[in-house]
Design a protein with these regions (language model features):
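Thiamine diphosphate
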Residues: 1-306
């Protein structure tokens, strides 16, 4: 995902000198071409995330289109006050990129497990929250976020699912359908969409036709797609590599409650309200915390009493 984002940034910066990239002393391998091509538009601020957001806000208020980059929790939790008071309060044109959503850096332990970010940031006014489901979406997302203006959070995974394609246009605030089905709708955000896709294929063996939706835009969220899932399928299952409290499942629930609609079946799949203290690779941790395709299948079979 990261490579696609950087390639898009390079293409955009060729025609727009106002695009500025700030990094918190990370990403050198992929930023070399950007730095050499646009030396006046690239700054390594060091391991100083609070200063990075402050600098980004100042540049944005002077008309620059700023992108900040760090990994996982570093570019969010270390500088949450600055994101709130500087960037969001001033509705500054800053796209905050965090590479390594969910368990992407699983082997580095809970300090690098990014599992509360969506819940925290979507509660702030004046910020969009986007978690691309595929590498192609990541490239489309950075372009849309910069062009739309305002403060945005772009959550990237280190992995990207294979065999996931949609003909729907990428629009912030709209989702994409990857498979059609009438019995249940699987709504996923981020690269864990791949697990939902695999599960949908296996569920056919049990007579369950699952619609698969990639909800890359969590804020603003696609309420129309949620309404359609409630009206035209047998229920909703949300799937996220994130704490269930405050994440995608909560956002979908809020839409249903606000609109007074009730899915026939409803299930949230994600991390329970706990710290992921186990160390391991992304796929291992998905399995350990019951959010891989096998766990998705078993949980859906259970709600269908199979």
């Amino acid at each position: 995902m990261r490579d696609n984002v950087v390639n898009e940034l390079i293409n955009l910066a060729k025609n727009d000198k106002d695009i500025v990239l700030l990094t918190g002393d990370l990403g050198f391998g992929v930023f070399e071409k950007f730095e050499s091509s646009f030396p006046g538009q690239y700054f390594n601020v060091g391991v100083a995330e609070q200063n990075m957001i402050g600098l980004a806000t100042g540049l944005a208020l002077e008309g620059k289109k700023v992108v900040t980059y760090s990994i996982g929790n570093f570019g969010i939790l270390r500088c949450l006050e600055q994101i709130r008071n500087d960037a969001c309060y001033h509705d500054a044109n800053i796209t905050i990129i965090a590479n390594g959503g969910g368990f992407s850096y699983g082997s580095l332990g809970m300090s690098h497990h990014t599992t509360e970010d969506i819940a925290i940031l979507r509660s702030l006014p004046n910020i969009s929250v986007v978690a691309p489901c595929t590498a192609d979406e990541a490239g489309e997302a950075i372009t849309s976020m910069i062009m739309n203006g305002g403060t945005g959070y772009l959550r990237l995974d280190k992995s990207s699912p294979k065999d996931c394609s949609s003909e729907d246009l990428f629009v912030i605030g709209k989702s994409r359908r990857y498979k059609e089905g009438k019995d249940i709708t699987l709504i996923a955000t981020g690269s864990i969409l791949g697990e939902a896709n695999i599960a949908s294929v296996e569920l056919k063996k049990f007579g369950i036709q699952a619609r698969v939706v990639g909800m890359h835009s969590i804020k603003p969220i696609d309420a129309d797609e949620i309404i359609d899932a409630v009206s035209n399928t047998g229920g909703i299952v949300t799937i996220e590599e994130h704490n269930k409290d405050g994440g995608l499942g909560s956002a979908v629930s809020e839409v249903c409650m606000d609109l007074g609609i009730k899915p026939n079946k409803f299930l949230r799949i994600g991390l329970d309200n706990q710290y992921s203290s186990i160390v391991g690779g992304q796929q291992y941790l998905r399995s350990k915390y019951n959010m891989d395709s096998k766990a998705i299948i078993n949980k859906i079979k259970k709600i269908f009493k199979l």
